[in-house]
Structure formats: structure tokens, C-alpha cells
Amino acid sequence: MLWVEKYRPKTLEEVVADKSIITRVIKWAKSWKRGSKPLLLAGPPGVGKTSLALALANTMGWEAVELNASDQRSWRVIERIVGEGAFNETISDEGEFLSSRIGKLKLIILDEVDNIHKKEDVGGEAALIRLIKRKPAQPLILIANDPYKLSPELRNLCEMINFKRLTKQQVARVLERIALKEGIKVDKSVLLKIAENAGGDLRAAINDFQALAEGKEELKPEDVFLTKRTQEKDIFRVMQMIFKTKNPAVYNEAMLLDESPEDVIHWVDENLPLEYSGVELVNAYEALSRADIFLGRVRRRQFYRLWKYASYLMTVGVQQMKEEPKKGFTRYRRPAVWQMLFQLRQKREMTRKILEKIGKYSHLSMRKARTEMFPVIKLLLKELDVDKAATIAAFYEFTKEELEFLVGEKGDEIWKYVEKHGMHRIEDETFLESFVKAEKEEKEESVEEVAEEKPEEEREEPRARKKAGKNLTLDSFFS
């Protein structure tokens, strides 16, 4: 079991933080009522923000519901889960929120909230702001490493508490308590060295301490070879440890990665067939599938403590399924699924931009733009001549990339025509007006060309007929 979880504080007294922070948090919790501002706990990683929130829930007798913003990329998902959790009273075993007359308060903890401000999370912050303005009936704590990635509006809606990096003495005291409980003999200078290398990150220090002390009854100064903690361990090195060794310490190495278990399982899945075959491959995939089951439970129930079981199965579980490591160099590959997901994300983003233009200039909702106009416009661009298709492209102000996305190579031809003729959209002109206007201009040009080729007397005849027929009714044209 990871020591980070094993020795996570259960009460506020066990949390390593300034007394002023603990006092403010207790005051907020005891005075909380519907409409109270959420707490925004801000500070660098490993200073106890999440631990404090969980300890607060335990102290107050509240049920803690943990969400991780970096793993719930869709703002709709965040709004559904946080919204339902904030406005209902109980949670089922399957992780679904249920309405109930009897139930205790739930402390909703949204971690890594500064990550929903990225491009792939468009709308996430807006959804959160809407939720807070609705005055949820449950206490809400937001956690961020960098609060200034959030908009001023969101920060102003919260009561912000800033955490400072822990001193190496504070970190060393925690490590000393863990060493005592684990029965490990260790000099205080060694603990101070580990604490210094962690740079004020208590979680990192505990992970380093566990990795160094694994299987030892005593930790000596010469065992601490760290010069500076590597913040981002090499994923390729972890792959080598899984496939080329039978050392169970790979689990600790994997937990130090700046990769989530969802990322690591893709790496293992991609490279497993390069190293294993036959029965070994079957057994390794069995371990990997069990890891995936735990990850699925994490996604459904938002219970991130199950990550450790998934991580163990995808590293040590897969590693121990081989009789002997395969010799020789293996070039490990990045997960192919990432490229596919990236392409799908690009496709969705391009479609969204096109639909926004169609909706804007056709005065339609996004839904109607998608279901009614998008297929028609795509067909017209494909089937019409380049000059007519260019009229549509100019009207909707499609870019070259958007045209190529819609009709492939023809999109480049359409774009060149638009550029060559300086075509642009006329404000307040409807699509039908624009298209009819282009058709009319083309017919007039055609009539003028034909007229120039006719003799003078033939050109005069239509004018006389037009003059004589000014007062004729419509029926007279067919008599």
C-alpha cells in the first residue's frame, strides 16, 4: 500500500499546515450555509490541500465526494456530476447521485480546477461559475496549484486560502513519524536530505522515502543517492523495468511518473505484444484487463484511491507474468490511441467552428445548424461548380482548412477562386440573397455576351418588345 494513502491525515490536527489556515477552514465549515462562498485552496503540489479537505470532511461528519477536473474534460460532465452532487443529498454505490429527504451534507472536492481552463476544457470554468451562482445546497471546495489560471470572476466567487511550500523540517518530521510506525531505523540527516530533494512537496518526499526504504530495516546515508528529485520520471525507463526486469520496485517508479494511470495503461497495452507472446501474453493481458476494471470504477465512482490497485496490476502484475525477460533492445512506441484521440479531437473542433459560422450567418441554433444546414452545405460545396461553391464559402467566411475538411482537395480549388476574385461576405445579406445575386450576375453576363454577338436589328427587337409589353398582364405572355 502506498504510504501516501496509508498515512494520509484523518483529522485536522494531523494536517501539516499553518495554524491560521486550519483556523480559517474550521470557521468556514462551522458557519457554512447555503449560499456561502466555496473555498479555493491554492498552492504548489504536495502541501496538503487535498488532505486538509478530506480531514475537514471527516471532522465535520460530512461525506467527501472527490472529483478531479483534469480527468473530467467535458464541461457537461463537470456540470452534471458537480451540479447533481451539490443539489442532492445522497450517493449510490454505483456513484449515481440520488435525491433523498434523509442524508448528511456532502463536501464536494474538485481537485486540479485550474486545469479546466485549457482549450480542451472550453466551457468548464463557465459551467462551474454557473453552478456557484445557483447557490448549491452542499459545501464545495476547489483545489488549484495556480489560482491565477482561473478567471477573476471565479476567484471572486470563492474564499481563497493560499498554502506555502512546507519547510524541509516540517517534511522531515512527517517522515520521522512514518519511519517509527514502519519500524525503519533512519538517521534524521537522511530524512532531511530526502525532504530537501523533494522541494517542499510532502507527497513527493513520502514517495521517495518509500521507494528508498522498500525491503529495508535500516536506511543509511549511502542509500540516499538522490541529488535532485526528478519531477518527471522517464516513462521509457518504467517500460524497461516492466518488460526487462522482475523487480517489483517498478510500482514505486510508476507512481512517481508525471503520468496518470490512464496514460500508463495505454503505454503498457501498446508495447506488451513487442515483449510477450503465447501464454505469457494472455496472462499479462488478464492482469491489464483487471487494472482497466479498477480504472473504470474510478471513472464511475470518482474514487481515486482505487488508482493504486490499478497501478499495481498494470506494472507488477504484468511484469510477473513472464518466465524470463526478453533479451535485446526493444524500441518502445507511444500509444497509437493517443494519435487517434488527437485526430478525433481536431475533427470535433473543426466541426464546431464550422457549425458556429453556419449558425451565426443562418440565424440557427447549433443543433439545427448541425442537423439541417451542415449536410446541405457540404453537399452543395461538393456538387456545385467551383464558382458557385465559392459564393457559399465567401458567405460563411470558411477558411481554407475548413473547406478542405468539408470537401477535401476541391476545398483548395474553392479557396483559390475566392482569393483570386476577392470574394467576401456582405453584411446583413442572407445566404439565399447572396446565392441568387451571384446567379443573376452570371446570367446578365451571359446575356450581354450573346447580345454582342447578334446583329444590331436583332438587338433592337427585344427592347421594342419590352417597351410595348409594359402594361401586359401575366396571362398575355402565354396567349
Curated annotation (Swiss-Prot):
Compositionally biased region (Basic and acidic residues): 452-463
Subunit structure: Heteropentamer composed of four small subunits (RfcS) and one large subunit (RfcL). Both subunits interact with PCNA.
Annotated positions binding ATP: 43-50
PANTHER family, alphabetized: CHROMOSOME TRANSMISSION FIDELITY FACTOR 18 (PTHR23389), REPLICATION FACTOR C SUBUNIT 1 (PTHR23389:SF6)
CDD domains: AAA (cd00009), HLD_clamp_RFC (cd18140)
Keywords: ATP-binding, DNA replication, Nucleotide-binding
Source organism: Archaeoglobus fulgidus (strain ATCC 49558 / DSM 4304 / JCM 9628 / NBRC 100126 / VC-16)
Protein name as it appears in the record: Replication factor C large subunit
GO annotation terms (biological process): DNA replication
Role description: Part of the RFC clamp loader complex which loads the PCNA sliding clamp onto DNA. The complex possesses DNA-dependent ATPase activity which is further stimulated by PCNA.
Top-level taxonomy: Archaea, Methanobacteriati, Methanobacteriota, Archaeoglobi, Archaeoglobales
Record field: transmembrane: none
Region feature Disordered, mapped onto this chain: 441-479
GO molecular function: ATP binding; ATP hydrolysis activity; DNA clamp loader activity
Entry superkingdom: Archaea
One of the Pfam families matching this protein, by short name: AAA
Family from the record: Belongs to the activator 1 small subunits family. RfcL subfamily.
